[in-house]
Amino acid sequence: MFDMSSSSSGWVAEIYLRYQLKRGITRLIERKQVGPLMVQRPFYPEHGSSHTYLLHPPGGVVAGDLLSINVVVEEGAHSLITTPGATKFYRSIGEVARQAQNLRVEEDAFLEWLPLENIFFPSAAAILETNISLKVSSRFIGWDMLCFGRPMLNETFESGNVIGQTKIFVDDKLILADSLCVDSTKFKAAGMREFPMLGAMYIYPASEALKELVHRSIQDYLMQTKESLEIGLTDVDGLLTVRALGHQTEEIMGCLVLIWKTCRKLWLGYVPDIPRIWAT
């Protein structure tokens, strides 16, 4: 979390959400918020799991904003959290926008962290930090989609800087530290290879059966859609990471959604409907 007393010229916003299983239904039992970060009332479209829409500051994120998002899913609970739209990071004239996400998933709990994309406008300056704490018996599916510039408008990320770090722990042991530093002048050095879109998906636990199904799903998606995605898979201590480079949000999200459905069917025995907000 950020020091909420620290000086900032922008929004200082923090939210804390705690989910608990009660009589077979996951409930949002605790919510604390400061500033414009908020959630809509959870709803239950499937089998007792809780779906929550996280609302970011109106109008997007600007230089000097400090955002802190904290989620705890207690033992046996199952929560899906998404956003109703892309989060936009606007240009900076000096200050940096910062966003910290701290996600904790307890024994036998399941968190699906599925926000829509972050869009970084030219001259944006941002630091993104994500810490995910799991137990051996937890389940987790989460993704980040980052768009640099606005490719649909032929607007490139010709200036700006974005630094990101994701750390994932299992039983307090660090098993993944993913870092990203995108400078407008060094796209290739950042691993972007001049693609404007980057997607990363994290799946735990990844059995051999799950990895085979995910690999097959990706192959089928690429053959059917003819999308020009670059996709790689890595497995570290049972954590499967999917990384994708592309030109548009739709092509990357289409692939990640298919992987999500594949994992859900293996774990829970059915294919979920996508959150309705994604279709609006």
Curated annotation (Swiss-Prot):
It is found in: Cytoplasm. Keywords: Chaperone, Cytoplasm, Nickel insertion. GO terms for molecular function: nickel cation binding. One of its GO terms (cellular component) is cytoplasm. The keyword Chaperone applies. Pfam families: UreD. UreD, UreF and UreG form a complex that acts as a GTP-hydrolysis-dependent molecular chaperone, activating the urease apoprotein by helping to assemble the nickel containing metallocenter of UreC. The UreE protein probably delivers the nickel. Belongs to the UreD family. Required for maturation of urease via the functional incorporation of the urease nickel metallocenter. HAMAP family: UreD. This is Urease accessory protein UreD. The gene is ureD.
